[in-house]
Amino acid sequence: VRGFHIFGFQSFILTKKEVEDFYEIYKGIPNQDYHGLVRQGSSGRCLVLALSQGSGLKLTEEIPSVVEAFRKLCGPSDPEVCRVLYPDSLRAKYGGMNQEENAVHCSDLEEDGILEVEYFFTLLQPYQSV
């Protein structure tokens, strides 16, 4: 993706427990189908990217971080909303019919991004041979 530097890329087939651990923070949050997220996340192969700012990514007051820039590229979590309001977003192009099948997970906060990279590339990667 233009403007981002990919410093980590790995294919995973996650167990239900690994997905439950990853999405633990969403458990009990209104408008989040935790069980749907777990079901979708453990349904097959997923590709995990770790991104940083590349030379083509210009941060501004409106988009102050790599996380915000990637969230904008992904679009809102509902692919149907994306198709109407953000037709060029990743979720509009590749998402399914609901929030669980929205094609892309992206961190909510800069701090979450760091923890999520550590989860996949430090905790899980040594145990994955996919």
Regions found by a protein language model. Give the residues of each.
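Non-catalytic terminal and connector segments of soluble metabolic enzymes
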Residues: V1-V130
